[in-house]
């Protein structure tokens, strides 16, 4: 069971390598996998402490050459942009040592500007070598977002839309929603279409109880 193994900073699924750098998140989504599982693919993603940049780089260095990875993704049991500087430093390390042979992606709830006030988050990601962001929209309006994602920030939904709008000019942007009853998938798709970004629906992974 995942709960019996050491917490993983680096894990892999299919052709992608993932970096689990924090368990902090400003949202408390009722459907989040971490509410009823300790990890995925046999990896335990419940961190005992946040890894330093040096620790992330060390773990990454142990596995990065084991396969021709399609993407390296900042994604775990938390919001990566809670640790923007860690994301930037690790991305820069990857580009410095491995060039552009692998795509770098950040999976985010899109609240990077709220988490990092007074910073040009999107441009900093671009300058560090990040290619793509996958933004979890998970709603078709503010009321639904507040209901299912339960954000700690006021006006989180509006800020997610702002993040998408600013990111699309510099990065490859995909918007995702989870297939749950509260979300109007068509209306969410219309938002993505209006913003001019790609759209993907993710299946809801049910708890086992």
Model-identified regions with their sequence ranges:
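Alpha-helical elements of the RecA-like P-loop NTPase motor core of helicases
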Residues: 30, 143, 186
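Conserved strand-to-helix beginnings and helix N-cap segments that scaffold or border functional pockets
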Residues: 84-88, 118-119, 185-189
């Amino acid at each position: 069971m995942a709960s019996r193994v050491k917490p993983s900073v680096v894990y892999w699924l299919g052709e992608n390598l993932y970096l689990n750098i924090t368990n902090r998140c400003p949202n408390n989504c009722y459907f989040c996998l971490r509410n009823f599982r300790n990890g995925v693919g046999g990896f335990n993603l419940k961190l005992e402490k946040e890894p330093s940049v040096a620790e992330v780089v060390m773990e990454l260095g142990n596995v990065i050459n084991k396969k021709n990875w399609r993407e390296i993704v900042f994604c775990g049991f938390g919001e990566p942009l809670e640790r923007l500087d860690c994301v930037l430093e690790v991305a820069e390390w990857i580009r410095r040592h491995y060039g552009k042979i692998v795509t770098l992606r950040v999976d985010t709830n899109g609240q990077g500007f709220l988490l990092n006030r007074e910073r040009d988050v999107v441009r900093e990601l671009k300058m560090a070598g990040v290619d793509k962001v996958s933004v979890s929209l998970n709603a078709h309006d503010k009321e639904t977002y507040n209901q299912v994602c339960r954000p700690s920030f006021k006006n989180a939904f509006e800020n997610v839309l702002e993040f998408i709008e600013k990111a699309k000019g510099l990065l490859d942007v995909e918007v995702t929603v989870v297939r749950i009853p509260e979300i109007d998938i068509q209306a969410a798709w219309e938002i993505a279409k209006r913003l001019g970004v790609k759209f993907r629906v993710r299946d809801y992974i049910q708890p086992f109880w």
